């Protein structure tokens, strides 16, 4: 089931136009607001914040930008499912699939079983952003426009979306293929972040240093790096710094609001290889 959110077209992060299209709608007169979103930005439309919960969630990583987030009530959110790109292909089920970028490494929605709702960060044609802002069962989902760095002589900058998921009282931000630290407009739209799923691969996206700058901006308690293939050199550069790092021998973890670290810590999930599934 494909759910198309309202679309918005604007020039690359011109502040007045960005606020007009993405922020002003949130300032309308609905009184319920997300715990994640900036308190000055109120969501519009009939979308309500899910009831507060404090259960444990599961985060499972399949490689690249492909995650499965499972709430304590069993709602499964799939992010950026990949096609054939060298990682093992999982058998995965989901209620909702988010697509941050229209590329075969991010939009293989047919892989996901269960007739999920599909939320695309870009309108058909790939050159306009969609504004996503809804509650599905116990999970609030909204997006933030980002740019990936393209090849200037051919593509220039490529549009995409990051997504925020509020579940079980936690604010989880999937940064998408972001190519530089966030500007003030984007930071306001992102809001509070507890868990950051952060791109670090470089070339077309931020690299290790850019990823660390985004940690400084968002101040999450838990950071899970992504989008670095099997490049351990990139990972070593990302973990070389002030943040405590944990290397897990599994591709999943469970956590809750009450068990988050007090200061930012990096959790490195296992990169799956053939034979691991």
Regions found by a protein language model. Give the residues of each.
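Short, basic, low-complexity termini and linkers enriched in Ser/Thr/Gly/Pro
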Residues: 1-31
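Cap/insert and terminal regions of metallo-dependent hydrolase folds
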Residues: 180-273
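P-loop/Walker A phosphate-binding loop and immediately adjacent motor/lid segment at beta-alpha junctions
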Residues: 51, 108-144, 212-228, 244-248
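Glycine/Thr-rich phosphate-binding loops of Rossmann-like dinucleotide-binding domains
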Residues: 87, 106-108, 206, 233
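Core dinuclear metal-dependent hydrolase active-site scaffold
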Residues: 34-92, 120-191, 251-277
């Amino acid at each position: 089931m494909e759910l198309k959110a309202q679309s918005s077209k604007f020039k690359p992060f011109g502040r007045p136009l960005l606020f007009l299209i993405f922020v002003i709608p949130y300032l309308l007169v609905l009184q319920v607001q997300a715990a994640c979103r900036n308190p000055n930005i109120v969501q519009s439309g009939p979308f309500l914040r899910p009831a507060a919960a404090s259960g444990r969630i599961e985060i499972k990583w399949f490689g690249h930008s492909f995650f499965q987030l499972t709430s304590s009530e069993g709602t499964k959110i799939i992010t950026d499912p990949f096609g054939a790109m060298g990682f093992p292909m999982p058998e995965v089920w989901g209620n909702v699939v988010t697509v941050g970028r229209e590329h075969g490494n991010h939009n293989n929605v047919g892989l996901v079983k269960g007739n999920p709702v599909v939320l695309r960060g870009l309108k058909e044609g790939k050159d306009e952003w969609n504004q996503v802002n809804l509650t599905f069962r116990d999970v609030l989902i909204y997006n933030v426009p980002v740019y990936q760095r393209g090849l200037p002589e051919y593509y220039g900058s490529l549009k995409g979306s990051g997504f925020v998921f509020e579940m079980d009282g936690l604010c989880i931000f999937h940064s998408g293929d972001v190519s530089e630290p966030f500007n003030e407009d984007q930071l306001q739209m992102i809001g509070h972040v507890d868990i950051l799923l952060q791109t670090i691969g470089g070339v077309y996206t931020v690299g290790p240093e850019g990823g660390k700058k985004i940690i400084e901006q968002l101040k999450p308690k838990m950071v899970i790096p992504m989008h670095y293939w099997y490049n351990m050199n990139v990972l070593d550069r990302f973990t070389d710094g002030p943040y405590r790092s944990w290397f897990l021998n599994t591709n999943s973890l469970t956590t809750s609001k009450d068990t988050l670290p007090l200061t930012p810590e990096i959790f490195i999930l296992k990169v799956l290889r053939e034979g691991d599934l």
